[in-house]
Amino acid sequence: NETREAKEVHLYGCMEWCLWNAVDDSTNYQRNLNIAECEAEERILYHKTEYRERRDHYAYYAVNRDTAGWDTDRNTFLGPMGDWSAPVLVERESSAFSCITGWYPIGCHHLKIALAPGESQRVIFLLGYGKNPRDRKFLSPGVIRKDDAHTTAAKYADPAAVDAAFAALGRYWDSLLSSYQLRSGEEKLDRMVNIWHQYQCMVTFNLSRSASYYETGTGRGMGFRDSCQDLYGFMHIIP
């Protein structure tokens, strides 16, 4: 707050959940509007689509302080005929506490922050992935086990832990990307080759481990030819 008056800020941290499948996320099938499921706690929102039926993993969206409200239904948050430029709940400075079954799942935390003149505060939002043993998926019927989420959210509720994690991540990528550096005299070309191309090659390698001859990429993973190409892209990074 850089003014001389006390301020109250309504802060919304909001993101959309995927449906675990790139094809489902991109197609207009009625089935996609029937499967979404979420759970909610005071500081953590959970995405558990198809968890009961055939998954042992879930996603979560956490914040490191108490909230004034939350929502998991995109239609409720945006409003009738609404869009992301002016969500109806933001305009109303409120929350509906919507816990979705079907339709379009989101995670939205609503915080009210009081700032004295000259004061600043830091809020940490955490997007994560949790997994449970298949024989220990539920705490009770319909309620997922959340040990991974609770442990990770507690760890990174401390700003010092977040700073340390980002510093470690920076050192990790510096060690990988420093294996090769282009100095062309063209800043944009250097940035593309030295950072983004190498980063993309490394991520693609980590995600492409299938030895199939027929896979198409989006629907069933990566194919054998694609995986061979990935090898050439990262060999200079971790020879």
Question: Where are the regions a protein language model picked out?
Answer:
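Short Pro-Gly-centered flexible turn/kink motifs
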Residues: K7, I113-K131
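A generic structural motif
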Residues: N1-R4, Y129-K131, H236
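Short beta-strand segments enriched in hydrophobic/aromatic residues
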Residues: M15, L127-Y129, F234
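Beta-strand-rich interaction surfaces with strong enrichment in secreted/lumenal proteins
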Residues: A96-I100, H110-L115
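Polysaccharide-binding surfaces and accessory modules of carbohydrate-active proteins
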Residues: E2-R92, R134-D174, S178-S179
